[in-house]
Amino acid sequence: MTADGRGAVFALLDDCDASAARRSSRLYTGFVHERVCADAAQLEAVCEAAAADMQAGLHAIVLADYEFGRHLLDGASAPSFKTQHGDATLRFLLFERCEKLSRDEVETWLVRQDGGLAEPSVVGTANVRESVEAEEFNAAIAAIHAALRAGDSYQVNYTYRLSFDVFGSPVALYRRLRARQPVRYGALIALPGGAWVLSCSPELFVEKHGATLRARPMKGTAPRSADPATDRAAAEFLGSDPKNRAENVMIVDLLRNDLSRVAQTGSVKVPAFFSVEPYASVWQMTSTVEAAWRPGTSFAGILRGLYTGAIGWLDAASGPAGANQNVCGDFCMSVAIRPSAQADVLRGTMGVGADIVLDSVAQDEHAECRLKARFLTGAEPGFELFETLYATREEGVRHLARLSASAATLGFPFDAKAVRAQMAAQCASLPAQTAHRMRLALGKSGATQITTAVLTPLAESTVGVLLASDHDFATMQAGDPLLRHKTTRRAEYDRGWREAEAKGAFDTLFFNERGELTEGGRSNVFVKLAGRWWTPPLSSGVLPGVMRGVLLEEDTSLQAAERVLTRADVLNAEALMICNALRVALPARVIR
């Protein structure tokens, strides 16, 4: 999975503008150790120790948690706004090797880590949750407005967290985000202990190159549009809007003030004002602030002067020239998204926020935060959701509840009312008294596609099934969250029922890594043991089929229940039954 082997610590700092002539991306491998600073009083000592490591030939990157910045603030003057909890540390990761790469070389490396697939493997987010409700957001903005009126500040960045589940690998997620939003400050970092950092933020916090310090604050956002004329109009509006320009000026003034603390007197300048840049889901307004580094100011000194609580990663590639803490090498800091791995499940967090001034409207700022998050939550996962439904001209179609629930969980926009109207119109055009198979597909963008075909009767009332373990099929993984949703990521399932048809059967029954029966490629399965019908529980890795639910919850004569089942249970069963919404329930027999 990584350059050093599965589970190894590494860091990829990824510049979308890197080329063969200017290999500005960096891949750090051969992890040696880390140095962690949890106390601002120890910052200089930790930086000095890391500088000694670099003088000895190691390469360093630095990750600074959001909350660490609060340790560096002067408590007497810092506003006491409540912030999100973090581990409040700054850590140096030290590596033996640093390889410079072009953009294409980075892509080649990422492909290798993602199983050699030209297209990124299936990955995405689910169960996205905001750390604040709308009422809490509004109350926080009201409190900030009160503080602004009291003169505590004239602009405050309010940030909250999104929490989400991640299905698929962090490498695949980074590949998809990288393709969706190329940036100069991308990062994919596997940390000690199994956590990950992913960054596709376009915002530069601060960098030092030679004697130049540079910051590129972002303030001002407008939504992108698929319509070119609307998209251009949004960019033009953002560039000329007085409110956005005023807020951008405030941020620039803050950075000018911060840089002046660590710069040569009179050297602070703003070479670029109000630049409007396109990204995946938004236009962003940026400005550039530069200053001449004050000789003798250490990296720790720059942090104390500038760091106000931004989540950051740092590329200290050139590093200090020696172990003297008063010497500062080149570096580059930017904000980061941080999905973290926990056991077999990936949990992610991402900070989103807005700069609040006196005329900021809470509802508008909340909408802007959600818009900024769309580059992640709206990323294409590599599959569609779909349903295969029984349809007639007379009865229409029945179930959309499962598709609606899956769409909500996986973040697919779904207009159920509009889709029902489309399906009703499709059913009205079908021949009378003729059963049809209707397939409804839903894309990540919310686009739908409906197709129909005549439903061919089965040749036999009792159908045959194969056992996947007898025919070289893959083992299912019970913990795979996508097994709970009907998606087009089902190559093994499709191969299962097609091979079954080729052998005169209807379906293939699959098993998980624990040897538990799960489901068929296109059906759920029920097994009769000692006079009682049983079906595998969802925890075995089972799609909650519509007909399965009917048989469990509504068919009182069947009295079926859930239970972990095995291959032996299938072979020794008194009877077998498979079911789906298209064919209802069918008696089955194993073909070996």
Please tell me what each predicted stretch does.
Residues 248, 285, 364-437, 441-592:
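Helix-start/capping segments and mature chain N-termini
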